[in-house]
Amino acid sequence: MRKKIEYPASDLLIQPLAPDDDLSSFSCGVNSLDDFFQKEVVFCHKHSYLTAYVVKSKKDKCIIGVFALSNDVISLEEDDVEDIKDKIDDEYKFMLSRQLSFPAVNISHLAVSSDYQGRGIGRMIVLYVIVLVKRLRFSGVQFITVDSMNNPRTNKFYLDLNFSNRSIDDFGAETRRMFLNVMDFE
């Protein structure tokens, strides 16, 4: 059964990173993410390595979240393909059985300001990405991928949003490769 995409109306604005967006003091409390957003994301966005977005309060235009998207491909094992076949239209199943690599959008970085964590903003961002790839159809996308920071809180966050671990091989690594089948959503 497909899940309906719902996120609450809010006082937040999501828009592409603009030249006047100042991320120099943005902090989510994770040094590697803070460094990326403060020092690298503008360059990566400018040169189309990724597309960065900011989440702002409509009231005071304060940046409370940042995320970046890039194109990706996910290769699935035959067992994984079998698991998703029942969610595929019959007319497309023959194609599914002939391929093991699928187009995806990668949430390459996602962070919420330390002052705003625990308020559902990260969840809203992921739901926004699902809507973006599912409804706008800006390119062929069947999956959303993420390399989740490998800690219990972050892994639980993505698992609660129906992401699956790609494998158990990265269990002890710094990040865990996870994916979400966008065909699970209306």
Segment roles from a protein language model:
Residues 48-68, 81-84:
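Conserved beta-hairpin
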Residues 50-54, 66, 104, 109, ...:
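Short hydrophobic/aromatic beta-strand element in the GNAT-like acyltransferase core
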Residues 68-109:
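Conserved acyl-donor/pantetheine-binding loop and adjacent beta-alpha core of acyl/acetyltransferases
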Residues 113-115:
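Active-site acidic-Proline motif in GNAT/NAT acetyltransferases
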Residues 118-132:
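Conserved acetyl-CoA-binding loop-helix of GNAT-fold acetyltransferases
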Residues 148-168:
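Conserved active-site alpha-helix within GNAT-family acetyltransferase domains
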